[in-house]
Amino acid sequence: KDGMLYVSLGQPHNVQPRDKIKLYNDVGIGGMVRMNAFDGSKREVYATGIRNSVGHDFNPKDGTLWFTDNQTDGMGDDIPAGEIIRITKAGQFFGYPWIQGKTRITEHGYDKDPLPTNVTNPEVYMDAHAADLGMAFYTGKKFPAKYQGGIFSAQHGSWNRTNPIGARIMFTSLKA
């Protein structure tokens, strides 16, 4: 609708080294960038503090951008939780590498730092290490009405849990 192309740029590390924070934030690695969809001009970092978003979609109800975020590995079977996050305005920060969801990140000592005060929390928590990839808001007419406006997400499944989970299609209702 806005003529912009939104691209997620995942972290190239399980947890980024401290000396990469400024560079990655400046160019949008571990974030979401946007640019003119027709000629690539007006590129800007739209959001930061994201580990590895793969799927994203615009909510047709309010136009906000929602996305999945894959978790840090090696912290345990059930932490950190997977996330579905909503961007409501440009410049939002989602906490990574200091926190992911409700879990402080221990690698490189990020858990010893004060938690940044400007963290926007996820809208939905998913199973840890299920690897939520694609997602889409459902607006079709083939499924019952309870699915309208909700999110279908695809999980490719875990590789690093004691008891693997996935691959599966999940549904998240956004109705209160």
What are these model-predicted stretches?
Residues 3-4, 63:
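Loop/turn elements at helix/coil->beta-strand transitions in domains of secreted/extracellular proteins
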Residues 6-9:
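A conserved catalytic-loop motif detector
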Residues 1-3, 84:
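Short amphipathic alpha-helices and their capping/turn segments at secondary-structure boundaries
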Residues 11-19, 26-44, 51-52, 57-176:
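Beta-propeller domain segments
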